[in-house]
Amino acid sequence: MIIGVIGAMEQEVMLLSKQLAKLNIWQQARCNIYSGWLHGKKVVLVQSGIGKVSAALGCTLLLTNFEATLVINIGSAGGLSPALAVGDIIVSEEVQYHDVNVTAFGYDKGQMAQYPLLFPASPSLVALTKQLTEHTNINVVCGQIISGDIFINGGQELYKLKRRFPQAIAVDMEVTAIAQICYLFAVPFVGIRVITDIADSVSHKSFKDNLITVVSHLSLLVSDIIQAL
């Protein structure tokens, strides 16, 4: 088993990379790659950069160069549900684009041409994540995450998202692109995101203020998942 983990930003992968034994670090196509061992398992961790294209590139490297057998996407997200708070962890049951529109050709909003509307996460990885957090004080919510190349900062963008995608509980900029690559390679994936903001008019400030603190909880959870696999 080779476990692939991918995050967009240095802050999102830094703590997990420090846990890897026999660590090798290098760069390819502007992706920072960390290869090592954790809990007796081979782990390849990629810091891809922000956005859908960077995420798709990083995931493709994981699957072609390292033949990862599963992919865990980690990082931050903006909360869309009023029930969510900063520090809550979101586990993707399914993911979808919010900035894709080829409805002129009969597709639904958010559906890429020639692809399904929704990309489901691995049920077993979702179940394992839920199981590992049952007896903790971490609030874990499973549901739909939507992705696009927009940092949602309140206003009309937030209003449009909530109106067009009422089932979505969180928004990010990478996980659906990663899911699409995993779909092409028939490799199981799950997205695990921590809420850093609630996508409102001060979300940029909340994101900066909260990122380092809340990501520490996420790193511990991912380490537990790797141990349990």
Curated annotation (Swiss-Prot):
What CDD domains does UniProt report for this protein, alphabetically? MTAN (cd09008)
Q: In which pathway does it act?
A: Amino-acid biosynthesis; L-methionine biosynthesis via salvage pathway; S-methyl-5-thio-alpha-D-ribose 1-phosphate from S-methyl-5'-thioadenosine (hydrolase route): step 1/2
GO terms assigned for molecular function = adenosylhomocysteine nucleosidase activity; methylthioadenosine nucleosidase activity
- Record-listed substrate binding positions: 78, 152, 173-174
Which EC numbers characterise this protein's activity in its record?
Answer: 3.2.2.9
Pfam families for the chain: PNP_UDP_1
- Which cysteine pairs are covalently linked by disulfides here? none
Task: Tell me which Gene3D superfamilies the record gives.
Answer: Nucleoside phosphorylase domain
Q: Which InterPro entries match?
A: MTA_SAH_Nsdase (IPR010049), Nucleoside_phosphorylase_d (IPR000845), Nucleoside_phosphorylase_sf (IPR035994)
Say yes or no: keyword Hydrolase present: yes
Give, as one word, the top-level EC class: hydrolase
Kindly list the GO CC terms recorded for this protein. cytosol
Q: In UniProt terms, what function does this protein have? A: Catalyzes the irreversible cleavage of the glycosidic bond in both 5'-methylthioadenosine (MTA) and S-adenosylhomocysteine (SAH/AdoHcy) to adenine and the corresponding thioribose, 5'-methylthioribose and S-ribosylhomocysteine, respectively. Also cleaves 5'-deoxyadenosine, a toxic by-product of radical S-adenosylmethionine (SAM) enzymes, into 5-deoxyribose and adenine.
Among PANTHER family, the record links this protein to:
5'-METHYLTHIOADENOSINE/S-ADENOSYLHOMOCYSTEINE NUCLEOSIDASE, 5'-METHYLTHIOADENOSINE_S-ADENOSYLHOMOCYSTEINE NUCLEOSIDASE
UniProt family annotation: Belongs to the PNP/UDP phosphorylase family. MtnN subfamily.
| The protein's name in its UniProt record | 5'-methylthioadenosine/S-adenosylhomocysteine nucleosidase
Q: Which organism is it from?
A: Baumannia cicadellinicola subsp. Homalodisca coagulata
